């Protein structure tokens, strides 16, 4: 699906170089099509890199998606130019009276930070509560999953002693579920987190359907029965070199990180890794857009009643 973004957004030229169909707003306005409105709450430090990753996965379908980027942290960014944030991001107050077909809440490097110490925790709570009445389906990724489980289900923060980092094999538990339609019985996906998501805890404290898991990673993909909530605890959006960049960053900082599992050839950080999860990431996002967003959202968002019959 061609994604509609501002003409000047850096992702436009970046993704077009990959032959990804990106439609600038100026052209999209000439087509009489009701685009899906998708809001992305980008909590990652390197926002431009994260934009490229998610927009790539959202682009592979025949309908238009109108992308809106949201920020909730008013502090000065160390990794993204202020001009970029001011030009391409909106504040919550700008969109709080609008409705959206989809919302994506990204991960954040906050695995060792208590919720009460997260600078924008009240804003996270506000957005998640707001989405109940203003968004058809919300997709939470990595740390955002942990935050949402706490806010929506009261599940306390669970933290691993050692960071989970690498590319892991997962089992599809419900192959005929809409979100896993077309999945192989086993598939690979990257993880980079301290957060822990034991399958038994998800089953005990929620009514969410667990769709994919791994012995090493715990629950990977789960969703609400009404399709309004979807959770993915890994990073299917990551580029081939994202884990390598994180490993080098932590190593340079003297944190003595573990080498990401099943990632570098021969587990040698001097060798260039290859992505083994791209097809899974594209299929996951295509299924979410089709079955959780497009097929249940109203044509007129002013008449939103995002529930299944």
UniProtKB/Swiss-Prot annotation:
One Pfam family named in its UniProt record: HTS
Active-site feature positions: 142, 235, 237
Catalytic activity: L-homoserine + succinyl-CoA = O-succinyl-L-homoserine + CoA
One MF annotation (Gene Ontology) recorded for this entry: homoserine O-succinyltransferase activity
Pathway(s) the chain acts in: Amino-acid biosynthesis; L-methionine biosynthesis via de novo pathway; O-succinyl-L-homoserine from L-homoserine: step 1/1
Important for substrate specificity (site feature) positions: 192
Residue numbers binding substrate: 163, 192, 249
Subcellular location per the Swiss-Prot or TrEMBL entry: Cytoplasm
Record-listed E.C. numbers: 2.3.1.46
Keywords assigned: Acyltransferase, Amino-acid biosynthesis, Cytoplasm, Methionine biosynthesis, Transferase
HAMAP family xrefs: MetA_acyltransf
Gene from which the chain derives: metAS
InterPro entries: Class_I_gatase-like, HST_MetA, MetA_family
Gene3D superfamilies documented for this protein: 3.40.50.880
GO biological process: L-methionine biosynthetic process from homoserine via O-succinyl-L-homoserine and cystathionine
UniProt-annotated site: Important for acyl-CoA specificity, residues: 111
Family: Belongs to the MetA family.
Any one of the GO CC terms: cytoplasm
Top-level taxon: Bacteria
Descriptive protein name: Homoserine O-succinyltransferase
UniProt main location, coarse: cytoplasm
